[in-house]
């Protein structure tokens, strides 16, 4: 079983989604997990403990294991991500320029089949960018941070 498959099976078995996996040259293994309700430190601890056990049993060599949430600027990698975050603001970087641009910022529309839509502000007002997962170099949510006090 490949490392990604092993980790994804473990993470999904615990009720989480594997968002991303990075392995650095210095033996560090970074795992990014999510779930609809969000991720708390206890979730990261739970996944870390289970992965440490699984990686030891499978004799996977690593120096350090880090499990965390994908953050406010979460990457979008799967069609299900675009479905889940439809209506959210995102930045999409295409592999090849379209109309002289590679980077677009706008509001995601729910995928229709394999086609994803992004409503953005063009030169002449609102415009729609249609693309597929194969067209994307990078896609991330735009963080929404509210610094207003919650007290009323």
Curated annotation (Swiss-Prot):
Name the CDD domains on file: YlxS_C
Q: Which SUPFAM superfamilies match?
A: YhbC-like, C-terminal domain, YhbC-like, N-terminal domain
Q: Pull one GO CC term from this UniProt entry.
A: cytosol
The lineage's top-level taxon is Bacteria
Extract the InterPro entries matched here: Ribosome_maturation_RimP, RimP_C, RimP_C_sf, RimP_N, RimP_N_sf
Pfam families from the UniProt entry: DUF150_C, RimP_N
Spell out the subcellular localization from the entry.
Answer: Cytoplasm
Look up keyword Cytoplasm and say if it applies.
yes
State the family named in the UniProt similarity comment for this chain: Belongs to the RimP family.
| NCBIfam families in the record | PRK00092.2-1
Function of the protein: Required for maturation of 30S ribosomal subunits.
Protein name (database record):
Ribosome maturation factor RimP
UniProt lists the gene as: rimP
């Amino acid at each position: 079983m490949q490392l990604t498959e092993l980790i994804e099976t473990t993470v999904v078995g615990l009720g989480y989604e594997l968002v991303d996996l990075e392995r650095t040259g210095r033996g560090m293994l970074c795992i990014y997990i999510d779930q609809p309700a969000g991720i708390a430190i206890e979730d990261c601890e739970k996944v870390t403990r289970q992965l440490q056990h699984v990686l030891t049993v499978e004799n996977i060599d690593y120096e350090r294991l880090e499990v965390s949430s994908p953050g406010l600027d979460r990457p979008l990698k799967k069609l299900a991500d675009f479905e889940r975050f439809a209506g959210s603001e995102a930045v999409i970087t295409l592999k090849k320029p379209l109309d002289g641009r590679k980077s677009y910022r706008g509001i995601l529309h729910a995928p229709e089949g394999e086609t994803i839509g992004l409503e953005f502000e063009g030169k002449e007002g609102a415009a729609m960018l249609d693309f597929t997962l194969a067209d994307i170099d990078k896609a991330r949510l735009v963080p929404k941070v509210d610094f207003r006090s919650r007290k009323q």
